[in-house]
Swiss-Prot record:
Homodimer which binds Holliday junction (HJ) DNA. The HJ becomes 2-fold symmetrical on binding to RuvC with unstacked arms; it has a different conformation from HJ DNA in complex with RuvA. In the full resolvosome a probable DNA-RuvA(4)-RuvB(12)-RuvC(2) complex forms which resolves the HJ. This is Crossover junction endodeoxyribonuclease RuvC. The gene is ruvC. Its EC number is 3.1.21.10. It is an enzyme of class 3 (hydrolase).
Length: 155
């Protein structure tokens, strides 16, 4: 089964795709970011996110999507990120991709063994689990792989 991990954002959406076989062996298929143009109107940026996510869904046909659950912080970008997350959830639902959601502490706990793990500890755990020699970049893509692994581990 293919699992798509998503780290929501407006400027950059991290994505990570992993595949697990019947023997529960896991490998990375792809990872990267959906980047939007900060000079565009928010609505146009949302359209770009949905369009690029559709391309990923059609190419990889994920059987599950794992999405980081957003918590409110006092920030001017909060509303925009929540809206972008809504676009992501809607697009996944339109393609009938089952969705699971995890808060950051649960992702850290599932992947690195501690809900308070530091970013580099999570990255090391992702690299170990996926047998990667080079760290996935950018950070949003690495985070998305951790989210995808959490989707696998929580099944």
């Amino acid at each position: 089964m293919v699992i798509l991990g998503i780290d929501p954002g407006l400027a950059r959406v991290g994505y990570g795709l992993i595949e697990v076989n019947n023997q529960r062996q896991v490998k990375m298929l792809d990872c990267g970011i959906i980047k939007t143009n900060k000079n565009q109107y928010e609505g146009e940026r949302m359209v770009e996110i949905a369009k690029d996510l559709r391309v990923l869904i059609r190419k990889w046909k994920p059987g599950l999507a794992a999405v980081e659950k957003f918590f409110f912080y006092k920030s001017s970008t909060t509303i925009s990120v929540v809206q972008a997350r809504g676009v992501l959830i809607m697009t996944l639902a339109r393609f009938k991709v089952p969705i699971v959601e995890f808060p950051p502490m649960q992702i850290k706990l599932a992947v690195a063994g501690s809900g308070h793990a530091k970013k580099d500890e999570v990255l090391e755990a992702v690299m170990r689990e996926l047998r990667l020699k080079v760290p996935p970049r950018p950070d949003d893509a690495a985070d998305a792989l951790a989210i995808a692994l959490t989707g696998l581990f929580q099944q």
